[in-house]
UniProtKB/Swiss-Prot annotation:
<comment type="similarity">
    <text>Belongs to the ammonia transporter channel (TC 1.A.11.2) family.</text>
</comment>
<feature type="topological domain" description="Cytoplasmic">
    <location>
        <begin position="275"/>
        <end position="281"/>
    </location>
</feature>
<keyword id="KW-1133">Transmembrane helix</keyword>
<feature type="transmembrane region" description="Helical">
    <location>
        <begin position="64"/>
        <end position="84"/>
    </location>
</feature>
<dbReference type="GO" id="GO:0008519">
    <property type="term" value="F:ammonium channel activity"/>
</dbReference>
<keyword id="KW-0812">Transmembrane</keyword>
<comment type="function">
    <text>Transporter for ammonium to use as a nitrogen source. Under ammonium limitation acts as an ammonium sensor, generating a signal that leads to pseudohyphal growth.</text>
</comment>
<feature type="topological domain" description="Extracellular">
    <location>
        <begin position="172"/>
        <end position="187"/>
    </location>
</feature>
<feature type="topological domain" description="Extracellular">
    <location>
        <begin position="85"/>
        <end position="122"/>
    </location>
</feature>
<feature type="topological domain" description="Cytoplasmic">
    <location>
        <begin position="416"/>
        <end position="497"/>
    </location>
</feature>
<protein>
    <recommendedName>
        <fullName>Ammonium transporter 1</fullName>
    </recommendedName>
</protein>
<feature type="transmembrane region" description="Helical">
    <location>
        <begin position="395"/>
        <end position="415"/>
    </location>
</feature>
<feature type="transmembrane region" description="Helical">
    <location>
        <begin position="123"/>
        <end position="143"/>
    </location>
</feature>
<keyword id="KW-0924">Ammonia transport</keyword>
<dbReference type="GO" id="GO:0072488">
    <property type="term" value="P:ammonium transmembrane transport"/>
</dbReference>
<feature type="transmembrane region" description="Helical">
    <location>
        <begin position="304"/>
        <end position="324"/>
    </location>
</feature>
<dbReference type="Pfam" id="PF00909">
    <property type="entry name" value="Ammonium_transp"/>
</dbReference>
């Protein structure tokens, strides 16, 4: 996070500024405020983007559940962020590990400059960062695909955000946080968002267990257009995710947008080339996976690295994330949607490469006049140690606490993580939500006969219980046949995940 203002309104009372006697707008640049508001909307659109991305990758029977959980993350974390999340993460007081409850219920956040970015008021920075907090559990919860109950997922979102995301974000972005004081670089969330969600997804996959037919069935994306749509939403929103992390309308934010676009583009190309070399055909899903890998990898360094470095980071991010998709076979974990590979490994790669390619002249684009050091390319070699400390500590903390939380939840009545085997076969959409992503018109209706005179005749029919039973039986057989045909077609055409 970056800031570029000298104005410091004095808070008074519980509002953080008396708007009845002081024009609080005078302390902030309207352009900065407009850009962060726009970035907030851009980051919001990423959350349904995650839902569509996961919905397309998941099975047809779990498509709606992925969309449902992504939107529930928005609502649940919005309340958590208002209740105490923002205060725990960005309060002006606190030790090196967690903030205070001084801003509980958004007290003293009206006109006071944020601790995370003094260029904007607390209330604006709160809603912007609230979108970061909301998307992180949405990323992690995809690990429940095809077998996770909805209610425990929602409880997990609230608790995990409070005890995992908030502390890691505090360490990283709050001036009192120990990683911030150490000097680690994380412009937009390599550790708080991607490493933490990737490790949480790995923990969820381990605790919830494998899908019932894991190892006997090749899983295929059920809806490639949904994957593409989700990627478009993510790519579009990521401009605000990284660009808005400048916390001001300045050249550093512009550079963050430029390197974000480059890394995504190169990541998509490299993943496609790897897919083609391996399978001898191009893959739309592969391009989308690669673009997301590039976006994840560039996130921590987006406000630190020059454009040429973004090309390298996007390419290496795609290579390492692609290789990481095979880790789940080695460690025998059913990471259904490759969340650990994309976000956990991608975030780690981005953190390390930021130490190598950070440039002091890119940091100076915010115009704040702060003394900058850069990374290896500017001979600041200790930065690699700082980035390693950041990466290891955040990954270990997220994984350990997520495992403990999920283990305890799984033994609490009503919070068991997994549906029964029978319900898993029927699908989460039907069992947990009572809805389906796709409704097919039954093919039992026969067209009316046409006579030689061209007149159509229809015969009246009498419905009774016997005919209804036959119709229901025929409908069930028809649906089963469509399911088999769909699976065969998917296995023949779509790339494996």
């Amino acid at each position: 996070m970056s800031s570029t203002t000298d104005a410091t309104p004095t808070p008074s009372g519980v509002n953080g500024g008396d708007s009845m006697t002081v024009n609080l707008n005078q302390f902030y640049n309207n352009g900065d405020v407009a850009w962060i508001l726009t970035s907030t909307a851009l980051v919001f659109i990423m959350i349904p983007g995650v839902g569509f991305f996961y919905s397309g990758l998941a099975r047809r029977r779990s498509a709606i559940s992925m969309l449902f959980l992504s939107m529930m993350s928005v609502a649940i974390v919005a309340f958590q962020w208002f209740f105490w999340g923002y205060s725990l993460t960005f309060s002006h007081e606190g030790g090196p590990y967690i903030g205070s409850l001084a801003n509980f219920g958004l007290r003293q956040t009206l006109g006071r400059p944020s601790s995370g970015a003094s260029s904007v008021p607390d209330i604006l920075f709160c809603v912007f960062q609230g979108m970061f907090a909301a998307i992180t559990p949405a990323l992690a919860i995809g690990a429940a695909a095809d077998r996770g109950r909805m209610f425990p997922c929602m409880v997990f979102m609230f608790l995990w955000t409070s005890i995992v995301y908030d502390p890691i974000a505090f360490w990283t972005w709050n001036p009192n946080g120990w990683l911030n004081k150490l000097g680690s670089y994380d412009f937009a969330g390599g550790s708080p968002v991607h490493i933490s969600s990737g490790m949480a997804a790995l923990a969820y996959s381990i605790v919830i267990g494998k899908r019932c037919d894991h190892g006997t069935t090749k899983y295929r994306p059920h809806n490639v257009p949904h994957v593409v749509l989700g990627t478009v939403f993510l790519w579009f929103g990521w401009f605000g995710f990284n660009g808005g992390s400048s916390a001001a309308a300045n050249m550093r934010g512009v550079m963050a947008v430029v390197v974000t676009h480059l890394a995504a583009s190169v990541g998509g190309i490299v993943w496609c080339v790897i897919d083609f070399a391996k399978n001898r055909h191009w893959s739309v899903v592969g391009f989308c996976e690669g673009a997301v890998a590039g976006l994840v990898a560039i996130t921590p360094g987006s406000g630190f690295v020059p454009p040429w470095a973004a090309v390298v980071i996007g390419a290496l991010g795609a290579v390492f994330c692609y290789a990481a998709t095979y880790l789940k076979k080695i460690i025998r974990v059913d990471d259904a949607l490759d969340i650990f590979a994309e976000h956990g490994v991608g975030g780690m790669v981005g953190n390390i490469l930021t130490a190598l390619f950070a440039a002091d002249y890119i940091e100076a684009l915010d115009g704040s006049g702060t003394a900058y050091t850069g990374g290896w390319i500017t001979h600041h070699y200790i930065q690699l140690g700082y980035q390693l400390a950041d990466t290891v500590s955040c990954a270990a903390y997220s994984f350990a606490v997520s495992c403990a939380l999920l283990f305890v939840m799984n033994y609490i009545p009503g919070l068991s993580l997994r549906v029964s085997r029978e319900d898993e076969v029927l699908g989460l959409d039907k069992i947990e939500l009572g809805e389906s992503a796709y409704y097919y018109k039954d093919s039992t209706d026969e067209p009316p006969p046409i006579t030689t005179s061209g007149v159509q005749y229809t015969s009246p029919t009498v419905s009774d219980s016997a005919s209804n039973e036959k119709e229901q039986e025929h409908r069930a057989q028809n649906e089963a046949q469509k399911e088999e045909e769909y699976r065969a077609e998917s296995e023949a055409q779509a790339p494996a995940i």
